[in-house]
Curated annotation (Swiss-Prot):
Residues 22-231 are extracellular. This is T-cell immunoglobulin and mucin domain-containing protein 2. Belongs to the T-cell and airway phenotype regulator (Tapr) locus, a single chromosomal region that confers reduced T-helper type 2 responsiveness and protects against airway hyperactivity (AHR), the hallmark of human asthma. The human genomic locus appears to lack the Timd2 gene. Residues 253-305 are cytoplasmic. Disulfide bonds join 37-109, 50-61, 56-108. The keyword Transport does not apply. Glycans are attached at residues 86, 91. PANTHER family: HEPATITIS A VIRUS CELLULAR RECEPTOR 1 (PTHR47009:SF1), HEPATITIS A VIRUS CELLULAR RECEPTOR 1 HOMOLOG (PTHR47009). Residues 1-21 form the signal peptide.
């Protein structure tokens, strides 16, 4: 069978270049595909050749995939395109590894036989791989099923007291939405647990209208009022302390000013009194001297001539 294919391929290559040939080849995605191209080295010798994409009779492997010099590969576009035959013996069949659907299209083999170029055209069609394994996704059968959910709040503290507030009791009803799905009939129960309740919480509100919905809510005590009163007293104490400090400063300042003023007045009075006494002493001294003079003139009477 292989000899017949080689013989037919050789006849196709020996046809004149003007005669067009078009061979259809089919492949499966994910598997290698081989496009045969064999020429006789006894007729024209070992010659260069190339593989190209598209119709390359008029473009001569412009979109080249592989070039050979007749002995080895000189250019390779991608490792997916390989020549696995004996190149020097004329077996230049192209093998495309791991094909995909996008690899489909025209391919051409060009052999540079002296005096003329010979072409072999192929139209490759790659079909997608058909999976034979059974589907892993189960099919949903049966009638629609409704899941009913029930919320249960379980407080961890056992201490419960009733507030004396005249406000009416608060009732809370939890009604979850129903969800419908189709696999199997199941009923799910959802339980929610509240966090730990502090020991200083006193007010509780309990709703028991529905036996399925038993929700207990804990309300913290009203402590902000106590904190507000404490802050008010602290503010008053600070204000009183500031006023007392201000009054003390004013009294001390007034005392210092009055003391300095009294000292300055006593210092000025002393020189004035001292200056006022001096003229009196001078007058008395002058009078005393006059009297002395009078006494001195009296003991010596004038002699009569």
């Amino acid at each position: 069978m292989n000899q017949i294919q080689v013989f037919i391929s050789g006849l196709i290559l020996l046809l004149p270049g003007a005669v067009e040939s078009h061979t259809a080849v089919q492949g499966l995605a994910g598997h290698p595909v081989t496009l045969p191209c064999i020429y006789s080295t006894h007729l024209g010798g070992i010659v260069p050749m190339c593989w190209g994409l598209g119709e390359c009779r008029h473009s001569y492997c412009i979109r080249s995939l592989i070039w050979t010099n007749g002995y080895t590969v000189t250019h390779q576009r991608n490792s997916l395109y390989q020549l696995k035959g004996n190149i020097s013996e004329g077996n230049v069949s192209l093998t495309i590894e791991n094909t995909v659907v996008g690899d489909g299209g025209p391919y051409c083999c060009v052999v540079e036989i002296p005096g003329a170029f010979h072409f072999v055209d192929y139209m490759l069609e790659v079909k997608p791989e058909i999976s034979t394994s059974p589907p892993t996704r189960p099919t949903a059968t049966g009638r629609p099923t409704t899941i009913s959910t029930r919320s249960t709040h379980v407080p961890t503290s056992t201490r419960v007291s009733t507030s004396t507030s005249p406000t009416p009791a608060h009732t809370e009803t939890y009604k979850p939405e129903a969800t419908t799905f189709y696999p199997d009939q199941t009923t799910a129960e959802v339980t929610e647990t509240l966090p730990d309740t502090p020991a200083d919480w006193h007010n509780t509100v309990t709703s028991s209208d529905d036996p399925w919905d038993d929700n207990t809510e804990v309300i913290p005590p009203q402590k902000p009022q106590k904190n507000l009163n404490k802050g008010f007293y602290v503010g008053i104490s600070i204000a009183a302390l500031l006023i007392l400090m201000l009054l003390s400063t004013m009294v001390i300042t007034r005392y210092v000013v009055m003391k300095r003023k009294s000292e300055s007045l006593s210092f000025v009075a002393f020189p004035i009194s001292k200056i006022g006494a001096s003229p009196k002493k001078v007058v008395e001294r002058t009078r005393c001297e006059d009297q002395v003079y009078i006494i001195e003139d009296t003991p010596y009477p004038e002699e009569e001539s």
